[in-house]
């Protein structure tokens, strides 16, 4: 989760720069326990470095935080100014289960003797209420393609923010199509059209969002079916236009973020080019190929 200044949990000047695009929050089922851990709509801020921080709603566009790794959940204060000391996870058991399910489906389909579904089921049972987990598994077992599509979604939901989604999409040859899909979804969200038409214009919250409470927040207006009419009656002290920012400069910034989700064809420019400083220092050994 983003920290704007040094505070009661960290002496780093900032943290939590990267975050999900806002449509990811709405891709999750509302009862998926991973949603509110992964997609966090607030940041920690304060008036001055070293002050006690409080929660503030972050920008819808370019402001969400990934919430799986949080200074405020650690049992020590990060007292270094340049290193948080966290050990980054390389592989989780969920990755092994979903890889097994994917591999078996490719070899045997969803109804083969090795039972790809049992590995998928373990992830679904942990994430959803029993009835929804069963329904998703039944949908997946309808065909090999259906099972693959569920795997694509579940790996998104399970590993968002863990730096493996891009390589998954590359190996499936889906990077370009999913990036296009993201632009289209974000445009519909900005216009509150299609699957986002029932979202309210504003979010409603209290000043400070429960202050230093590190484990929860109260905010109305994020979910499908929330309305501005109800939000105005709930007694929150603050509200703000969020999906479509009120200020024209913020509107322009949001549209620019959508447009710049990618500049080059993702399927032909999948990786960073080699930086010029490394090429210059390689004694002619390194070059950028493939039209970089």
Residue locations for each model-derived region?
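Stable alpha-helical elements in mature extracytoplasmic
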Residues: 116-119, 143, 147
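Intrinsically disordered or highly flexible coil/loop and linker segments, enriched in small
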Residues: 44, 129-133, 157-161
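Acidic/serine-rich, low-complexity amphipathic helices located in mid- to C-terminal regulatory regions
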Residues: 144-183
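Hydrophobic face of alpha-helices
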Residues: 36, 117-120, 152
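Elongated scaffold/linker segments in the mid-to-C-terminal portions of large proteins
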Residues: 1-99, 106, 172-292
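Extended amphipathic alpha-helical segments enriched in small hydrophobics
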Residues: 85-130
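Short, solvent-exposed loop/turn and secondary-structure capping segments
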Residues: 37, 48-50, 134-135, 162-164
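Cytochrome P450 fold signature focused on the C-terminal beta-domain
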Residues: 132-141
């Amino acid at each position: 989760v983003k920290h704007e200044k040094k505070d009661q949990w960290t002496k780093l000047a900032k943290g939590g720069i990267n975050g999900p695009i806002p449509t990811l929050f709405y891709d999750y089922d509302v009862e998926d326990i991973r949603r509110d851990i992964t997609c966090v709509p607030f940041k920690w801020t304060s008036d001055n470095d070293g002050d006690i921080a409080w929660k503030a709603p972050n920008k819808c566009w370019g402001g969400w935080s990934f919430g799986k790794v949080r200074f405020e959940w650690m049992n020590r204060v990060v007292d270094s100014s340049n290193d948080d000391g966290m050990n980054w996870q390389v592989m989780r058991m969920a990755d092994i289960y979903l890889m097994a399910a994917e591999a078996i489906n490719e070899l045997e389909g969803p109804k083969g003797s090795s039972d790809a579904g049992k590995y998928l089921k373990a992830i679904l049972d942990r994430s959803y209420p029993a009835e929804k987990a069963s329904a998703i598994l039944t949908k997946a077992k309808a065909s090999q393609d259906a099972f693959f599509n569920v795997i694509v979604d579940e790996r998104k939901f399970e590993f968002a923010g863990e730096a493996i989604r891009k390589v998954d999409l590359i190996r499936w040859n889906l990077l370009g199509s999913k990036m296009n899909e993201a632009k289209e979804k974000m445009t519909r969200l900005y216009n509150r059209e299609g699957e986002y038409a029932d979202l309210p214009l504003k979010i409603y919250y209290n000043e400070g969002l429960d202050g230093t409470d590190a484990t929860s927040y109260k905010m109305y207006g994020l979910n499908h079916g929330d309305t501005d009419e109800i939000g105005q009656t709930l007694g929150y002290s603050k509200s703000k236009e969020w999906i479509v920012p009120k200020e024209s400069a913020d509107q322009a910034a949001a549209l620019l973020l959508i447009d710049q989700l990618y500049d080059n064809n993702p399927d032909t420019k999948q990786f960073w080019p080699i930086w010029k400083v490394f090429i210059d220092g390689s004694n002619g050994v390194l070059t950028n190929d493939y039209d970089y």
